[in-house]
């Protein structure tokens, strides 16, 4: 299976090209549009006056819903991004955002380092990680108020844990959302997805069942998050979200249950968030790959059957000779086209 990487390779390539051109004394005039998953667009540009300064702007469908996520009002999305990027070498935050985009960063090529390039290439993931960070903070608060029983994490119960009505929603696609529900012993991530046809539903169900079975078979991944698949909203959502009637028959809910072991450290926390933000793309990509593989196999079988039928055809000259020979026993052939000898 293909594991998608969170970084945008086109951004990395563009920035490295700009740095190399600046070192050679011939800086590039930059005006590039770079696309990413989930209706995300980047714009990398500079001005003719100073080509060593780049602007990286991003526009994503999830921006409005993510910026609305609040915990206690002390941390906003803009402050979260400023804290993350202001400490990087060669990256500053301009006072104005480029028109038509949601967020803009200013890049000084002469001071840019590889770590800054890597962080710039995951800008979309950093934006989407904001509600996850809030949910983990809320989990810590709830767990201190009401510690979870030890057996809750061991059994991985499917019933909603104790908590309040805090729910973070990421509206990142048309009619598809990500719901993040913190509680006192876990953080529940719920993906709302829509399948295009019945075939996608079948492949999706088989694909997710393999997630469950592989977790049971392999001891090395038994500590992975629990995966649940349902037609109806899970218990965590029933009182807080009412799905629209549009595409009701094609709507499904995929639930991941994260326990403290999945976000103990900052590195592990970011790795888990990256995997979750890319799950929908990973999931539907492999559904399409499975359908393409099935179609190629069917085409191969049809081609092999056509070859068999072509070999079974009777040549016109042979057929005339057999008909003109008076009294000759009519020749019979097998399905491969060979004559039967008596």
UniProtKB/Swiss-Prot annotation:
Keywords: Actin-binding, Cytoplasm, Cytoskeleton, Phosphoprotein. It comes from Saccharomyces cerevisiae (strain ATCC 204508 / S288c). This is Actin-related protein 2/3 complex subunit 2. SUPFAM superfamilies: Arp2/3 complex subunits. Signal peptide: none annotated. Its main location: cytoplasm. Present with 13400 molecules/cell in log phase SD medium. Functions as actin-binding component of the Arp2/3 complex which is involved in regulation of actin polymerization and together with an activating nucleation-promoting factor (NPF) mediates the formation of branched actin networks. Seems to contact the mother actin filament. One of its GO terms (biological process) is receptor-mediated endocytosis. GO terms for molecular function: actin filament binding; calmodulin binding; molecular adaptor activity; structural constituent of cytoskeleton.
